[in-house]
Design a protein with these regions (language model features):
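Surface-exposed binding/hinge segments that line
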Residues: 125, 135, 169-211
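Gly/Pro-rich hinge or "lid" segments in bacterial periplasmic/extracellular proteins
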Residues: 111-115, 194-195, 200-257, 263-265, ...
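Long beta-strand-rich cores associated with HINT superfamily self-processing modules
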Residues: 517-545
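Ligand-site clamp/hinge motif
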Residues: 244-289, 407-408, 416
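Structural transition elements
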Residues: 344-380, 395-399
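N-terminal lobe/hinge region of extracytoplasmic solute-binding protein
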Residues: 76-128, 158, 221-222
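N-terminal secretory signal peptides
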Residues: 1-31, 55
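Extracytoplasmic/peripheral linker and loop segments enriched in polar/acidic and small residues
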Residues: 412, 416-427, 453-519, 544-545
């Protein structure tokens, strides 16, 4: 992606809306680029310039029909538990996301440049980024034969505002003041304030569309490319080709068995032995093994994925800002990058916006490794010469190795860290966010608004460190409705500063997505949203056996 420092004039919210409307009326991609004065820019560049409000060049996407139909594949993800769910609203793990994209569709869908493409929405119109009208495709049916209508969309979006749903994106959906059917195949969304990012928000996996009135999600009734043949939470799922899928020629595969192998070496062994065709979350140390196999390949994509040190701010010792700052100073970022991730990473700065992202604050001073200053702060906090447990698990990519490095650094500062290596099974349910010191792993989000809303807003269910900051919450709301891009960039920059300076999150690096793939799998590409092609591989790949 392009660093915004290299673009003299980023497209504003109003310009984005203007282009979006023109594209909806049939403007060509070339003319759209000319409108912005950037004719000749590559498609990837165009995606970052248009931003998430820009329309997708849906007709320019990879066309169906190029793949070979038929075949069954077996895929091994990293995380699984009895909490696995086919309810998109409750998706929490990469395993959930991958399954959800097998069985459901959204109104929009991200391409590999994080530009939202029209999917169940045939057209999206608006005049002020506050009231949006969505026209639905008329040729879409659910797996049970029911036709897609506006009522299904109203139900699917509205359920996120009900606390009983347990939606993981409930704070994000608070801006949806009203969602109503304005026709059999037309939905009107009224927001509390202008938000040019709506097409991007609608592409979030939690907002995939389900039939009106659904209460039993175990059957995975959606409009997606596959139907549920079997689903056993914590064990496996079997996805069977949807013969009535509304996208001509898709999907290619007849069946996908999806399992989880928590242990990374075992996952790699399963790939190399031919037991599975695809794996995600490959440890950089394993890339040589996969690369030496003539039958397999490594798929590497830089991303906004990060493994973070969580310092709970609602309990001691994290309540003391000196302790929190000391822990961040003990993260040797360059060593984490080279020793833990073998260079498959870029250095982070204790906030979730990755370098190269559109609103990345390049003026923010970099936190550097400084055990002497950390020692001073620990003494000031009354935390010198004590023993402190830190929870790590293979479930949080690289966290065990990072914890060991942190343990060595802390020793120099007079703090003894006791690394508790917890198993992957049950880590997210039983330990994540529940200890004074632990680790998380956050998959990339499509834009700053979604990232900040889900993980840093005071009342977000995934507010990992329990950080409460009224100024941050106010800026989040203001930035969401700001259509002047320069002002919006300033707000996001200030939010990064607040997180960097005050939040109990230490982000040493941003990690590349590394997948291992059988050479017979074709159509497989990278996506910065996450492994498994941003979890959307199911309808895009085929088996050339």
């Amino acid at each position: 992606m392009t660093d915004n420092k290299n673009i003299p004039e980023l497209i504003s919210g109003q310009e984005s809306l203007r282009v979006f409307e023109s594209l909806n009326r049939g403007m060509s991609r070339r003319n759209a680029l000319q409108m912005l004065g950037v004719a000749g820019v590559a498609a990837a560049g165009a995606g970052s310039l248009f931003g998430v409000a820009g329309k997708v060049f849906a007709d320019d996407a990879v066309a169906a029909g190029k793949g070979k139909p038929g075949g069954k594949i077996r895929v091994a993800g990293m995380s699984s538990s009895t909490a696995d769910t086919l309810d998109p609203a409750k998706g929490a793990l990469s395993t959930d996301y991958a399954r959800h994209y097998m069985f459901y569709n959204g109104l929009t869908r991200f391409d590999k440049h994080l530009v939202p493409q029209l999917e169940l929405a045939e057209r999206i119109d608006n005049s002020d980024a506050t009231v949006w009208t969505i026209t639905l495709r008329k040729d879409v049916t659910f797996h049970n034969g029911k036709s897609l209508t506006a009522a299904d969309v109203v139900f699917s979006l509205g359920r996120h505002k009900d606390p009983l749903t347990g939606s993981k994106v409930m704070p994000l959906m608070e801006q949806f003041v009203e969602v109503k059917a304005s026709g059999p195949n037309e939905v009107q969304i009224r927001l509390s304030a202008p938000n040019a990012e709506l097409p991007s928000i609608l592409a979030v996996s939690h907002l995939l569309i389900v039939p009106e009135g659904t209460t039993d999600f175990s059957k995975g009734i959606g409009t997606g490319p596959f139907t549920v043949g079997e689903f056993k939470p914590g064990v496996r799922s079997v996805a069977v080709r949807n013969k009535n899928y509304w996208k001509p020629g898709l999907p290619y595969l007849d069946e996908i068995e999806f399992i989880a192998i928590a242990d990374e070496p075992s996952r790699v062994n399963a790939l190399l032995s031919g037991d599975v065709h695809m794996i995600n979350e490959v440890n950089p140390r394993s890339t040589d093994r996969i690369g030496k196999s003539a039958k397999h390949r490594v798929v590497d994509a830089p991303s906004g994925n990060y493994t973070d040190l969580i310092i709970r701010q609602d309990q001691l010792p994290g309540k003391n800002p000196d302790f929190t700052q000391a822990m961040k100073l003990l993260l040797d970022r360059e060593q984490v990058k080279s020793a833990v991730f073998r260079g498959f990473a870029v250095v982070g700065n204790d906030h979730p916006i990755a370098p190269g992202s559109r609103y990345f604050n390049s003026d923010l001073p970099q936190t550097v490794y400084d055990p002497e200053k950390a020692k001073f702060l620990l003494k000031k906090a009354g935390m010198e010469s004590i023993t402190m447990p830190v929870m790590a698990s293979p479930a949080a990519t690289g966290s065990v190795d990072i914890a060991v490095l942190l343990q060595q650094s802390a020793k120099q500062a007079g703090l003894k860290l006791d690394v508790n290596r917890l198993p992957s099974d049950g880590y997210w349910s039983n330990h994540w966010m529940k200890h004074p010191l632990s680790f998380g792993n956050i998959n990339p989000r499509p834009n700053a608004d979604v990232m900040f809303s889900q993980f840093f807003q005071s009342k977000a269910p995934w507010n990992e460190s329990g950080w409460q900051n009224d100024q941050f919450d106010q800026l989040l709301m203001l930035a969401r409705g700001e259509t002047d891009d320069a002002k919006r960039a300033k707000m996001y920059g200030d939010m990064q500063t607040l997180v960097h300076d005050h939040c109990g999150i230490g982000i040493p690096v941003f990690i590349s997505n590394i997948d291992g793939v059988d050479q017979r799998i074709k159509g497989y590409d990278s996506n910065p949203l996450g492994g498994f092609m941003g979890y959307m591989f199911a309808e895009q790949v085929w088996l050339d056996a």
